[in-house]
């Protein structure tokens, strides 16, 4: 399973998403707006493949599932 979490600093739900995945014993790749995209949202949106406004955004096996609430639902 490939998990990518798109995040930004000071994002409570980004931290919750990362902790949820860690607590499930799964590995993930984090892509940070500031570190990986030079704080340019357009570059991040291009990588995500969809115009989204909320963070985090999560891809599982290269499919965008949405944000934190969708991540919780995915693993229920």
Where would I find each of the regions flagged by the language model?
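Structural micro-motif
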Residues: 49-59, 68-69
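Short alpha-helical
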Residues: 12, 39, 66
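Short beta->alpha junction loops/turns
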Residues: 10, 33-34, 63-64
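Non-catalytic, surface beta->alpha helical segment in thiol-disulfide oxidoreductase systems
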Residues: 60-76
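Local sequence-structure signature of Cys/Sec-based thiol-disulfide redox active-site neighborhoods
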Residues: 1-31
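Thioredoxin-like thiol-disulfide oxidoreductase module
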Residues: 33-52
């Amino acid at each position: 399973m490939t998990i990518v979490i798109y995040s930004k600093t000071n994002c409570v739900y980004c931290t919750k998403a990362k902790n949820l995945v860690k607590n499930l014993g799964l590995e993930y790749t984090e892509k940070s707006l500031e570190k990986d995209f030079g704080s340019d949202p357009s570059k991040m949106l291009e990588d995500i493949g969809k115009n989204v406004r909320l963070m985090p955004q999560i891809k599982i096996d290269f499919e965008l599932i949405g944000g934190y609430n969708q991540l919780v639902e995915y693993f229920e």
